[in-house]
């Protein structure tokens, strides 16, 4: 009987700390839980939360969409570029078809999302397949959204969802002190950086 040596232990690469806002922004899409959709107009429909988090300041931008597509992703980029007060150098996403054609038969053809990134001079970085931990900041924020927002809210229309999501993000997330930021809020970190320029 042959004895096989044990598999080598996986050693993750050290995390690359960002040095300034806009250096890299993580983007992902969250499916809104169907339990939050209680009106006959919205039962059976699907709503989506697009989320972007700046890795340096943890500043977050969210937007509600009725579809999960490369068109919605391109629209989200346009709104993110207008909302973020600094130049965006890189956007990191997973391998979803709303972001890339990497695992489709059109792999060489850029998506509308990628074309919009190119128009703004933004580099697109995709994470390794099946490694959501590489987009950990945005994934963690989605878990917090489940606890703080979706567990306690109902939506009676798409407009109602979009309005409540906007209020929640403005009130709760960007003004919430965070330990990795030295107990400052994302808005405070961004303001301090912009004042130092």
Functional labels for PLM-detected ranges:
Residues 1-33, 37, 97, 108-114, ...:
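Basic, flexible linker segments flanking DNA-binding modules
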Residues 9-16, 23, 120-122, 143-197:
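C-terminal domain-tail junction helix/linker
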Residues 27-60:
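An active-site-proximal beta-strand-loop segment
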Residues 45-46, 62-90:
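Active-site beta-loop-alpha junctions of metal-dependent nucleic acid enzymes
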Residues 59-63, 125-127, 151:
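Short small-residue beta-strand/loop micro-motif enriched in glycine and branched aliphatics
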Residues 64-65, 101-107:
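Short, solvent-exposed loop/turn segments at secondary-structure boundaries
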Residues 88-98:
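Acidic beta-strand-to-loop metal/phosphate-binding motif
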Residues 93-95, 104-107, 112-117, 122-147, ...:
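RNase H-like two-metal-ion nuclease catalytic core shared by retroviral integrases
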